[in-house]
Each structure stands twice: as C-alpha cells, then as structure tokens.
Amino acid sequence: MRLLIATIALALTSNLELNAQEAQINWLSIAEVTEAQKNEPRKVMMDVYTKWCGPCKMMMANTFTNEGLIEYVNKNYYCVKLDAEHPDPITFRGEEYTNPNYNPNSKGRNGVHQLSIALKVSAYPTIVYFDEEFNVIAPISGYKQPRQLQVLLTFFHDQFNSKTPQEEMQPLWDKYSSEFVGTW
C-alpha cells in the first residue's frame, strides 16, 4: 500500500514539475520577431540583461516565471532577450550592431554591445518596449515584480499610440497607473 501511495505521489509531482516547465515565455531572436511581425504584428518586449547582473537573475527567476505574465506576454507581445555584452553581431532594423570591445578572456564585465547603446540602455535589467514596427516606445530600467510589469505591459499594449503627442502621454499614464488594479 505504501508503495502504491509513493508511486502515485511521485507521478503527481512529476506531472506538476512538467507543467511548470512547460509554462515559460516564448523568447525569440530579433530575426524571428522581424519575420513574425510580417504575419502578425505585435508590440515587443526586450529584456536587456547581463550574465553578472543580480537583479536580472532575480527577474528571470521571480518575474518571468509568473503564470499570468507568461500567458499575457505570449498572447500579446513578442519577447526578446538581449545579453548586453553578447559578442556576436546583431542585425536590427537593417543595421548591423557589434560588440567591438568584447574580450573572450574576460571573467567579469565585458564590452557593451552597440545595440544596447543604441537603445539607450544604461542600467540592467532594462526592458525596452517597442511598437509593432520595432520603434522604441520606452526603455525602462530596474527590477520589476510581476504586478509592476503588468501595469507597464497592459498600458503599452492597450493605451499607447505612437500618434498621441508626448505631452498627452504622461497624464494618460498617470491616470492609468493610479487606477490600475493588478491581477498577477
């Protein structure tokens, strides 16, 4: 009887672990997003991180594993991870960006990728939000908990319009964020 109970418990635990492993953000490369935009335009969320960044690791473990967030971004956004110290060239909007100061022998921080600089990333983690044509909406730095990210994601998805004058966006954001009730 104990063996039967242990076997059932193990099977249930394995199934729960399998389900937890399946729920994850569908991270794409910039090239994959560029291609996907042709058939199904969406806004883009780009997580710019480094391997040595503690808050970046915390976001990966605590924020990007939230089931509500995963479901929302996989449905409404294309998601990209960009290592800001990545050594390889990246083509973005027809231009090639490199990391000319990358040192493969470096044990710690390394050269900053030109794409990270072009996107005005000055701290890690930074999430850069883009419209459907890969135009930057805003780079927003700092560790974000799921609810903090939810208000940004839903605002940019539901309220942002590139034709809205900048002076009208701040009052719109202030009102939206003050009335926002998170569900994650």
Tell me the role of every PLM-derived stretch.
Residues K43, T98-N105, H113-V128:
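Structural micro-motif
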Residues T50-P55, T63, A84-P89, F134-N135:
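Solvent-exposed loop/turn segments at secondary-structure junctions
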Residues E40-G54, C79:
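Short active-site neighborhood of thiol/selenol oxidoreductases, capturing the structured segment around
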Residues I25-K43, V73:
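A short beta-strand-turn-helix
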Residues Q21-A23, K120, D131, I137-W184:
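Non-globular targeting/processing and membrane-anchoring segments
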Residues I25-W27, L69-K107:
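Thiol-based oxidoreductase modules, predominantly thioredoxin-like and allied folds used
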Residues M1-E22:
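Bacterial Sec-dependent N-terminal signal peptides
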Residues K57-N74:
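Typically the conserved alpha-helix immediately C-terminal to a functionally engaged Cys/Sec
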